Regions:
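Acidic/histidine-enriched, glycine/proline-rich intrinsically disordered or flexible terminal extensions
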Residues: 89-102
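Generic "edge-of-domain/loop-turn" microfeature
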Residues: 14-16, 46, 60-61, 95
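An amphipathic, aromatic/His-enriched active-site/gating alpha helix that lines ligand/cofactor pockets
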Residues: 25, 29-37, 55-90
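Short, well-ordered beta-strand segments in beta-rich or mixed alpha/beta enzyme
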Residues: 3-9, 38-66
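Short, surface-exposed ligand-recognition loops at beta-strand->loop->(often short) alpha-helix junctions
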Residues: 10-20
Length: 102
C-alpha cells in the first residue's frame, strides 16, 4: 500500500503560471526519484492554489526525498511564489498515511 502525502501551495497573485513552470521542471526529478509511485497535480484556478498528491512506497522513502529537496534548496525557489513565503512551505505538507484498500 502506498504512503500518501498532500502538499498545498497557494500562489501569490500573478504567480500561478510561474509555479506551474517550476512544477513542470521540478516534478520530473521527483517522479524519477527512487520509490516515488506517482504525483498528481491539481490547480484550483479561482484560488490560485496548487495541490500535489504524492504516492510513495513507504514513509521513509518520502522522508529521504524531502531531505534531498530541502538540501538542494527547493524552499528558496518556492518562497517568492507562494503566499506566506518560505515559512509556509513545510506547513503546507501533510503526510496523510497509508492508502487503504477498502
Amino acid at each position: 500500500m502506498s504512503f500518501v502525502v498532500v502538499a498545498k501551495f497557494p500562489c501569490k497573485p500573478g504567480q500561478v503560471d510561474a509555479m506551474g513552470e517550476l512544477f513542470e521542471a521540478a516534478l520530473s526529478d521527483t517522479r524519477g526519484f527512487a520509490c516515488c509511485e506517482r504525483i498528481d497535480v491539481v490547480l484550483n484556478e479561482p484560488s490560485g492554489t496548487y495541490l500535489l498528491v504524492e504516492y510513495w512506497d513507504q514513509e521513509s522513502s518520502y522522508d529521504t526525498y524531502l531531505q534531498w529537496r530541502t538540501d538542494t534548496g527547493i524552499a528558496e525557489v518556492l518562497a517568492p511564489l507562494i503566499e506566506g513565503g518560505g515559512d509556509r512551505i513545510l506547513g503546507s505538507v501533510d503526510s496523510l498515511g497509508i492508502m487503504q484498500d477498502i
